[in-house]
Amino acid sequence: MAAAIADLPLIASGKVREIYDLGDSLLLVASDRISTYDVVHPTPIPDKGAVLTGLSTFWFEQTGGIVAGHLESVAEGVPDEVRGRAMKVRKLRMLPVEAVVRGYLSGSGWKDYQATGAVSGIELPAGLRESDRLPEPLFTPSTKATVGHDEAIDFDGAAALIGDRALAQRIREASLAVYRHCAEHALARGIILADTKFEFGLDSAGELTLGDEVCTPDSSRFWPVDEYEPGRGQPSFDKQFVRDWASSTGWDRNPPAPPIPDEIVARTRAKYLEGYELITGRPFSEWLARTGAHD
């Protein structure tokens, strides 16, 4: 289901995105595909690619004063057939670490804590419950697995992979600063940004630059504030909804992933759109109009 664009060289096709070469820049195209447990389902979620792109654009524009971002344009230089779900971005030398930040104890962080009392080697107070807010946001990096699952590592492991401890420290500081900014904004809009992951690279001048996507439903856990209750898993505006459904089917998390029923597709699309409009304060139709996308 890769998006074919005439005359543009396809550099990479991932679980959700295609990357095309524009010469001096790249074209990052978000599809409507959805993956859980690192496996892509055969059923797309309509408008998901446009929601991811619109939210990333919003956050890149919000956080440019914290760290440079790779976004160049969402309209100029973007082919008509992918407008709304594509970004023209700077070429970067990507760094081999997923920069994960956790503000709340959930997912693999909660499992780590239950087993060891720590997350990514960072000791935490005893007695924390699932979904509790952490005393401070934590930088809990992971590897970037080309096949299979990313693996959690500690800061020393991240610094070793990057090969430059000072650069790893800058990534940690930038990740925490961007997370805090986005989490504060989201909270004022009624959404808890529980955790997220970033990717960084170096531009042609060696400047640390935020790449990929920023605080989207695919890279983050978004929880509604008015339903937040520590001690359990939380309802969400992200793909946790599909993860929960997939887990309930008895699927063993190995390919192929099961098709997603129409009702789950419709509810997931509605969650994505609701999250977009709450966070940005703008109707989704405005994003489609801004980019010249076909509604």
For the regions a language model picked out, list residue spans one by one:
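C-terminal helix-cap and adjacent tail motif
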Residues: 214-275
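Short, active-site-adjacent segments that bind or coordinate small-molecule cofactors and metal centers
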Residues: 90-92, 188-196, 201-203, 269
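A short mid-domain helix/strand-loop element embedded in enzyme catalytic domains
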Residues: 133-165
